[in-house]
Amino acid sequence: MDILIGLLIIAIGSFCQSSSYVPIKKVKEWSWESFWLVQGVFAWLVFPFLGSLLGIPAGGSLFDLWGAGGAGMSIFYGVLWGIGGLTFGLSMRYLGVALGQSIALGTCAGFGTLFPAIFAGTNLFEGNGLILLLGVCITLAGIAIIGYAGGLRAQNMSEEEKRAAVKDFALTKGLLVALLAGVMSACFALGLDAGTPIKEAALAGGVDGLYAGLPVIFLVTLGGFMTNAAYCLQQNIANKSVGDYAKGKVWGNNLVFCALAGVLRYTQFFGLEMGKSFLTESPVLLAFSWCILMALNVTFSNVWGIILKEWKGVSAKTITVLICGLVVLIFSLVFPNLF
């Protein structure tokens, strides 16, 4: 029962993250860099900070926890993850919600599982290490199939249909950006690993296992915010869009929807940490929890892609290929449990 509860919590967080781009469509009169920065304030600073407060032992502080070790590396990996988050947003811009998230999150699922194992010295050619490696290979196969579906989609759609579904649709550029986003986004998992001493200190201080990892998440998202804020402000200056923040008549509307997008985006990590606390009885599921989250994100993002009509006008063959790719990705998560 605990495992089912853990998976359900992760699934809820995944659904929220995959829904985070829907409120963004309600933002008015702001350039991409402006709304990305404002939603980032909520997604990577405000809500992670509030969540981290739940992981502080009685009579302690965040600084006490961070002093346990690993804080600097968590922030560093967060900076790298921030590059992934930034290019992740660009992949949505060029490919749309469905295809962009599928490729970026699929790549992130594979490398986010493999990188921690490599750094931990795991032998990838025997035992559990081999299972991890094969699971990643299956994940990458799913990505390739989804990429092929994107190619079919581009061939079968007119220029007008492409622009109607995704304003800045650009397949080649989008694929490259999405792959980079996936690899760099996998650094989030490394940031969590680096912060293990902090989580252990929280547990030793009597914090419930549900919340013990939240102070580490704040460090990783803090690093990510640094990267994204620097880029967005540079783009504000280059594109002369700084004036977006002075458009008082849309501030109320835009702030609400950016905050909503931010809390939805953060919920995936909040749910991941809470869900993992229920998976301790299954080491395999615990090791693959990152992959589980990413695969669910891919599934839900494509559901939103269909709802938002991003696949409108494509052939039945293209949809079939897309579904096959998703099935392969989902199988990559089931695969480790077969042994």
Task: Walk through the language-model features, giving the residues of each.
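Polytopic alpha-helical membrane proteins, predominantly small-molecule transporters/carriers
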Residues: M1-F339
